[in-house]
Amino acid sequence: MEGLVVAAGGDVSLHNFSARLWEQLVHFHVMRLTDSLFLWVGATPHLRNLAVAMCSRYDSIPVSTSLLGDTSDTTSTGLAQRLARKTNKQVFVSYNLQNTDSNFALLVENRIKEEMEAFPEKF
């Protein structure tokens, strides 16, 4: 990306990838920071919702909340919780796909896991 400024210690990393899932092209944008991760998932350039999750020493389930958008749509918060548990980082997730089918969301999550296994340094 042109004009991208990365901190001297490599504290910021950007990673983009796409996948065709059920005939829909889905784009993924990952921004890895020192102790946190931002993940945007969508087909069009919109930020309709945003959730955050982080691990707590008081509970095995990461705490999460919706920061932006429809609070009844728990796709972002659920994904943020699972990624926070897996990475042990504070995770921000913006899931912006119209398809709310749970099987489709599982395909999206599996694609993210594949990318995490292939490029662990990006997460």
Curated annotation (Swiss-Prot):
Signal sequence segment: none
Entry GO CC: cytosol; protein-containing complex
Record has rRNA-binding as a keyword: no
Transmembrane segments: none
Keyword annotations of the record: Chaperone
GO biological process terms held by the UniProt record: proteasome assembly
Pfam families (alphabetical): PAC4
GO MF term list: protein-containing complex binding
Function: Chaperone protein which promotes assembly of the 20S proteasome.
Subunit (UniProt): Interacts with PSMG3. Associates with alpha subunits of the 20S proteasome.
Entry's family note: Belongs to the PSMG4 family.
PANTHER family to which the protein is assigned, alphabetical: PROTEASOME ASSEMBLY CHAPERONE 4 (PTHR33559:SF1)
Name of the protein described by the UniProt record: Proteasome assembly chaperone 4
Organism from which the protein derives: Homo sapiens
Gene: PSMG4
